[in-house]
Structure formats: C-alpha cells, structure tokens
C-alpha cells in the first residue's frame, strides 16, 4: 500500500527531534538479573545497552518532548501545527489517546489528534498518513510523534526478550517540500495478521481482558518467537525496500544512506549486505538504545540528521518491521 495524492504537491520532513531517558540499562546490569552474558547478547543482537524510562517518563511525555524539539527545529510555533499523529504500541492508556495527552502537554489546542498503531512500523505508517494529508491540502503542518515505553511490558525474568527493548520518543514535522527538507517518496507498506501471534502482547485488550489468571501467567508481557520473527523481518523488509526504491524511480545503487529499524544488528547487517550498502552508509544505534519500537527509525533519522552528514540530493532508505506483522519502507530525498 502507498499514498501519492497530488503530483503537484510534494510532502517533506521539515525537521526532526528525539528524546531518550537518562537511565541506562547495560548488559552488565542484565547479567545480574537473568541468566545471560554480555557476549551472548552482543553476539545475537548487537545491543550493549538500552535506555529505561522512569516512573514519570510515560509514552506521551517522551513523545511530547521530542515533538517540542522537532517544532523548534522546523522554525514553527506550536500554533502552526494543524494535525497530530501519534504512533505507539505502548500507549499511556487504552483511552484517551497518547496523542491527545501529548497535545495537552504541548499546549496545542483544537487540532485533530489520533493514535496510529502499527507496532515498530508505526513511524512509517504515520508518515504515510501525514504525507497524504499534506499532499491533499488537508493540513499544512502535520506533527508526527512516535514513542514507546516498552519497559512497562517487558518480563525482566525472560532473557530472550528483556535484553532487546528500550524506551524513547521521536518526532518530525511534515509540510510541503522546501529547500533543506527531506522529500517523502511513495511508501511501501504491508501487513499479515495471520502471523500476529509471533510478536504480541497477549492480554489487556477486549479479547483477553485483565484477570487474576492473566496476571499470574505473565500474559501482560511481550511474547515473541524470535527465530520466526527474524526470518519474516529480513524477507519482508527486503521486499518493501525494493518496492520503495522502484516507486522512487531510482536504482539500488543510488541509495546514499540506509536507516533501518534498530531491532537487531544481525537483521540490519543482513539487509545492508543484500543491497550492497557500504557499512559507512548504514546508520546504527541499536547498540546504544536497543529496540525502541515505533520511535526506532525516528530516533535513528534524527541522529543522522544532526550529524550533518546528509548532502543535497542524497537518497535515504528507511525500513521497518514490527508486530502485526507489519512492515514498510520509504525513500527520502534531501532537497
């Protein structure tokens, strides 16, 4: 699935922002909590540490702080934002939406605000909606926020999952293309609900509401079949990436920067190898932050932008994969 509403109007990312909690949970810390080792974690994931939010650093707040940075970097005032999209898999509440809570924190009044749920692919799904809104002329300045406090749903007695996830938030402002922005080409998105149970949070919704049994059996924690997820992640992201490159009208060798979902260094390296992208052009932060879910790609993009390494006419390939199962890719162009 992809969006391209108005060929005469091109949406672009004007500016980015991100937020990461101060608390660091290292592999050495995890060695004291579960039967694991730094070598075991790094060999399988590439992760050395991750950030963990404090009790008052909830999802909506992390997203709102990232949003404040993005709005400032775009040179806009908050009252110029006319739509807010909040991508998250770990909302503050089932309702009200995390977007509404972030809106209140930002002091932005009366604009449409809603949550987008596509797990770790949420940043790209939200970007597709923002692009459509801008190119259709529905809104002028769309604020996309992606944040997750996954530590609230991690079982820190399960060595297979507790080593993977961290907390954080990212944001960007999308408007009509202007010099210095990152133009958004047509996105390639997909999902396969038949495989949803491979990566899920089993309880807490209407299908399996909270109960004494669900609490005792640990069904409020993230459940994942790692080997199966790995297999589908590489294949689906490769397909989406090829499709997005074709939609952008360029060749694989034209890609200047690869900005993948920061879930596992082995997955990142496998994808980079398939596209023959030089290691110096592959942006990695997974070793520092682990998998921050919907905010993952956004945090990576923000860090890359602030290195000032992106040059005029550079092409950036963003890819993501997450629960659903869901996946997506897009090519951005620096103009």
Swiss-Prot record:
EC primary class: transferase
A Pfam family annotated for this UniProt entry: ACP_syn_III_C
Gene3D superfamilies: 3.40.47.10
Pathway(s) the chain acts in: Lipid metabolism; fatty acid biosynthesis
GO terms, biological process: fatty acid biosynthetic process; secondary metabolite biosynthetic process
Keywords noted in UniProt: Acyltransferase, Cytoplasm, Fatty acid biosynthesis, Fatty acid metabolism, Lipid biosynthesis, Lipid metabolism, Multifunctional enzyme, Transferase
Domain of life, source organism: Bacteria
SUPFAM superfamilies documented for this protein: Thiolase-like (SSF53901)
A GO cellular-component term linked to this record: cytoplasm
Region described as ACP-binding: 262-266
Entry keyword Cytoplasm: yes
Main location: cytoplasm
Keyword Cytoplasm among record annotations: yes
Molecular-function GO terms, alphabetical: 3-oxoacyl-[acyl-carrier-protein] synthase activity; beta-ketoacyl-acyl-carrier-protein synthase III activity
Active site positions: 120, 261, 291
Domain notes: The last Arg residue of the ACP-binding site is essential for the weak association between ACP/AcpP and FabH.
Subunit structure: Homodimer.
Family stated for the protein in its record: Belongs to the thiolase-like superfamily. FabH family.
Protein name (database record): Beta-ketoacyl-[acyl-carrier-protein] synthase III
Organism listed in the record: Chlamydia pneumoniae
Lineage, highest ranks first: Bacteria, Pseudomonadati, Chlamydiota, Chlamydiia, Chlamydiales
Name of the gene: fabH
